[in-house]
């Protein structure tokens, strides 16, 4: 049974927003109210349909139980009841999911970090493949991707690449991508046709805002230096590169992609805030670990999450034991949503189980 009090609050909030939008609002308040109304409308429609269905179901039961109902009408009611019951159960599940506690970071932009792991040059190439997969996936969502820093591999791909993904709900979609991604394929340089296994690590951080993290100047050690090229040689004469160390956590960010020290510092601080925020989220999650059994992945960067097997054309997500024989479509970003949707569904099921047992 759904909690009527919660549903009444939801309906009241929806009505209040509709009334608010009929009044005089400034631009910021109008955007906020419109966005919240758009989020609430689908679940409010489901609640109204659910309540109408409950009334209809009650009428059918009364008709079936009434001894004066003629045989034809009773037979019709009995045939309609299972269909209506199934629709009610689907609506109830939809509403329960909508009422689950929301991750406050789900609507945030993302700082995406992809790093080559074990496997040498092949790992760098795979890191490049992964980044392009996310880049194309983001484009399909209508999001914007901006590279913040990149260290290219010797034969292509990336040793490390950091980018900002800007778009509504970016973190909600991408947060389950964090972890170790493994690839199995025959490198172009492998004459014997032997399959090599390489890995890359993906970190998806919700972009922090200044109000999220209070960073004192005294907690920072800031060093400037001349930017260096791939071979270690200095590529400009000014000290535009910057390295910032957050002393309490030991988190270090170095930025040198821009010729402007000011831009490098701003980018480094943005990443630093996001990493500190992520570290705090990870710590809080580990403290709740006893309550998180069965949820999708731990978010641990060392957790192996997915294997891409090129010879067999398959992708396996180890957290939910899902295998898709759509590797070209996944790596092109086109079928990545199938994995993300399955992970989200599993996560929601785990949350529902926790809520039910609470």
UniProtKB/Swiss-Prot annotation:
NCBIfam families: prfA, PRK00591.1. It is found in: Cytoplasm. Keywords: Cytoplasm, Methylation, Protein biosynthesis. Residues 282-306 have a biased composition (Basic and acidic residues). Belongs to the prokaryotic/mitochondrial release factor family. GO terms for cellular component: cytoplasm. The keyword Transmembrane does not apply. InterPro entries: PCRF (IPR005139), Pep_chain_release_fac_I (IPR000352), Pep_chain_release_fac_I_sf (IPR045853), Prokaryotic/Mito_RF (IPR050057), RF-1 (IPR004373). Transmembrane segments: none annotated. Peptide chain release factor 1 directs the termination of translation in response to the peptide chain termination codons UAG and UAA. GO terms for molecular function: translation release factor activity, codon specific. The gene is prfA. PROSITE patterns: RF_PROK_I. Residues 282-308 are annotated as: Disordered. This is Peptide chain release factor 1. The modification N5-methylglutamine is found at residue 233. Methylated by PrmC. Methylation increases the termination efficiency of RF1. Pfam families: PCRF, RF-1. Gene3D superfamilies: 3.30.160.20, 3.30.70.1660, 6.10.140.1950.
């Amino acid at each position: 049974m759904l909690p009527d009090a919660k549903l009444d609050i939801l309906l009241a909030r929806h009505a209040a927003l509709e009334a608010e939008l009929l009044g005089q609002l400034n631009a910021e308040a109008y955007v906020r109210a419109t966005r919240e109304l758009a989020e609430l409308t689908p679940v409010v429609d489901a609640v109204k349909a659910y309540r109408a269905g409950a009334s209809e179901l009650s009428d059918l039961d009364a008709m079936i139980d009434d001894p004066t109902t003629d045989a034809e009408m009773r037979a019709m009611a009995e045939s309609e009841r299972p269909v209506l019951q199934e629709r009610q159960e689907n609506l109830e599940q939809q509403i329960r999911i909508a009422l689950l506690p929301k991750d406050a970071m789900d609507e945030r932009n993302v700082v995406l970090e992809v790093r080559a792991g074990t496997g040498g040059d092949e790992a760098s190439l795979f890191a490049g493949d992964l980044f392009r997969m996310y880049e194309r996936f983001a484009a399909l969502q209508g999001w914007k991707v901006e590279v913040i820093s990149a260290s290219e591999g010797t034969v292509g791909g990336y040793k490390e690449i950091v980018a900002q993904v800007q778009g509504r709900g970016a973190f909600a979609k991408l947060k389950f991508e964090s972890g170790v991604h493994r690839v199995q394929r025959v490198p172009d340089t492998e004459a014997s046709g032997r399959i090599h296994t390489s890995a890359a690590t993906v970190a998806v951080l919700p972009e922090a805002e200044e109000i999220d993290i209070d960073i004192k100047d005294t907690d920072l050690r800031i060093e400037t230096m001349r930017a260096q090229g791939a071979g270690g040689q200095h590529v400009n004469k000014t000290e535009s590169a910057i390295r910032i160390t957050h002393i309490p956590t030991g988190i270090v960010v170095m930025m040198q992609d821009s010729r402007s020290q000011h831009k490098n510092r701003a980018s480094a601080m943005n990443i630093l805030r996001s990493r500190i925020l992520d570290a705090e989220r990870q710590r809080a999650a580990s403290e709740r670990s006893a309550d998180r059994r069965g949820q999708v992945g731990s978010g641990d960067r060392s957790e192996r999450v997915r294997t891409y097997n090129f010879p067999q054309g398959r992708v396996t997500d180890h957290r939910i034991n899902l295998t898709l024989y759509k590797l070209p479509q996944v790596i092109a970003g086109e079928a990545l949503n199938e994995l993300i949707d399955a992970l989200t569904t599993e996560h929601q099921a785990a949350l529902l189980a926790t809520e039910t047992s609470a």
